[in-house]
Design a protein with these regions (language model features):
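Interfacial loop at the N-terminal end of multi-pass membrane proteins
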Residues: 2-11, 25-66
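Cytoplasmic juxtamembrane regions at transmembrane-helix boundaries
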Residues: 9, 81-104
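Loop-to-transmembrane-helix entry motif
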Residues: 12-22, 104, 108-112, 173
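Hydrophobic alpha-helical transmembrane segments of multi-pass integral membrane proteins
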Residues: 20-31, 72-76, 80, 109-121, ...
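Hydrophobic alpha-helical transmembrane segments
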Residues: 58-75, 142-155
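Transmembrane alpha-helical segments in integral membrane proteins
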Residues: 67-89, 156-165
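Hydrophobic alpha-helical transmembrane segments of integral membrane proteins
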Residues: 94-127
Length: 174
């Protein structure tokens, strides 16, 4: 049985390739910012409007920690994007329910879990260094949608594993 080709697959392939490059560029930019900010802390504190009366040291340490945790997201994002790319390739070949895709989904779920944990830590650091004089609003912390995505991908990994086993059983009986 032949299946109609989807226009979404080539688009997904190109978008994932672009996102992989952008992810590494993001990592390079954050690394450059960390190096620059720590090389010129007085200029950096002025650039982000830290009031003159505040001790810049805890803010600098906190922001450096946040950026460093942001750098940890780069390889996690890379893992997610490359696994998705391989899955798109298997769908394009008409062979998505294979054990490799179940393993890929499981790896994606673990990476998403790690990203959620990073977000919690980043949110906590942001709240710790924020003050009335230096309000810091980060899009980090607890996310119901993020945690639901983690659960969903773990479940999908199991569905793919079962689908691959059922397919192998079916091929063995035909």
């Amino acid at each position: 049985m032949t299946h109609p080709k989807s226009a979404a697959l080539p688009i997904a392939y190109v978008v994932l390739r672009i996102l992989i490059v952008l992810n590494w560029l993001y990592g390079a930019a954050v690394l450059g910012l960390v190096v620059f900010a720590n090389s010129y802390p007085a200029w950096f504190m002025k650039a982000i409007d830290v009031p003159a009366g505040l001790d810049p040291k805890p803010i600098m340490i906190g922001l450096t920690a946040i950026a460093t945790l942001g750098l940890l997201a780069v390889p996690l994002n890379h893992l997610i994007l490359t696994r998705l790319l391989r899955m798109v390739e298997t769908v394009g070949r008409g062979d998505p329910f294979i054990a490799a895709n179940a393993y890929r989904l499981n790896a994606i779920a673990w990476a998403l879990l790690a990203l959620q944990l990073l977000s919690l830590v980043i949110g906590w650091i942001g709240k710790t260094i924020a003050s009335k004089e230096f309000p810091l609003h980060l899009d980090a912390g607890f996310s119901v949608n993020g945690w639901l995505a983690v659960i969903l991908i773990f479940v999908l990994a199991r569905v793919f594993a079962e689908g691959a086993l059922m397919r192998e059983d079916l091929e063995g009986t035909v």
